[in-house]
């Protein structure tokens, strides 16, 4: 399961029981959570640790975490190979029985931030100049996401069982997803989902959260998990056979 819980607004302490119940309802073996603020870590972490004894605790200050029922390697946040800057991709290996599954948790760069990391949203646009500026920013952010995806793709050795999951901030068919597909990953929703599969609904419905898998992991089912107002994103849940 992957879930952007919109936790940077400081409200997770109140929402934690509902988020935990949503996750528990599906009982996934692995959960990747994004937008998890440092001050709210304990509220949800305490609940999840009852069900998930393994977690990537060293990522707590980065707002993205893995939780697992199976042992996890020490997670690492990847860096851009050219600039050396940290990117929104987190690597971790899960040890399931006698197999190793590579996990790539993603929270890729948003269209709603410019090169100075200043938040700019469609709702804040006031004139034609800002429309053009936002369109240019979309192009710049898209290129940045492609580079993030390229870095992630390099971490998938040939023949490796792998899952990529999270908020990619990009849609099916985008260059970002095509980069990951070129590394041998398949779009789980495209393969087995029902309907459009939007995971955000404002300002327009889009599927920007994705689970992608290597071909040796056979998809059994994939579902949208309604956030029920807890987050601006719905979660994604998938079942695989290997």
Predicted regions and their residues:
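Active-site-proximal beta-strand elements of phosphoester/diester hydrolases
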Residues: 1-9, 100-109, 131-135
């Amino acid at each position: 399961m992957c879930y952007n819980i919109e936790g940077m607004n400081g409200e997770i302490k109140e929402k934690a029981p509902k988020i935990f119940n949503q996750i528990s309802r599906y009982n996934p073996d692995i959960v990747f959570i994004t937008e998890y603020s440092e001050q709210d870590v304990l509220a949800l972490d305490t609940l999840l640790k009852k069900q998930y004894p393994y977690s990537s605790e060293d990522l707590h200050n980065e707002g993205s975490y893995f939780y697992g029922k199976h042992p996890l390697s020490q997670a690492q946040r990847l860096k851009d190979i050219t600039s050396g800057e940290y990117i929104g991709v987190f690597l971790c290996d899960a040890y399931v029985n006698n197999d190793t599954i590579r996990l790539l948790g993603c929270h890729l760069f948003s269209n709603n931030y410019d090169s100075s990391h200043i938040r700019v949203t469609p709702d804040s646009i006031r004139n034609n100049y800002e429309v053009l500026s936002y369109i240019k920013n979309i192009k710049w952010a898209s290129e940045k996401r492609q580079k993030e995806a390229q870095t992630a793709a390099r971490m998938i050795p040939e023949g490796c069982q792998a899952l990529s999951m999270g908020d990619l901030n990009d849609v099916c068919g985008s260059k970002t997803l095509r980069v990951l597909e070129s590394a041998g990953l398949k779009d789980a929703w495209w393969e087995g989902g029902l309907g459009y599969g939007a995971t955000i609904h404002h300002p327009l419905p889009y599927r920007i959260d994705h689970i992608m898998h290597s071909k040796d992991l056979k998809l059994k089912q994939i579902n949208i998990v309604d956030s029920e107002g807890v987050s601006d994103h719905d979660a994604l849940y998938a079942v695989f056979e290997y």
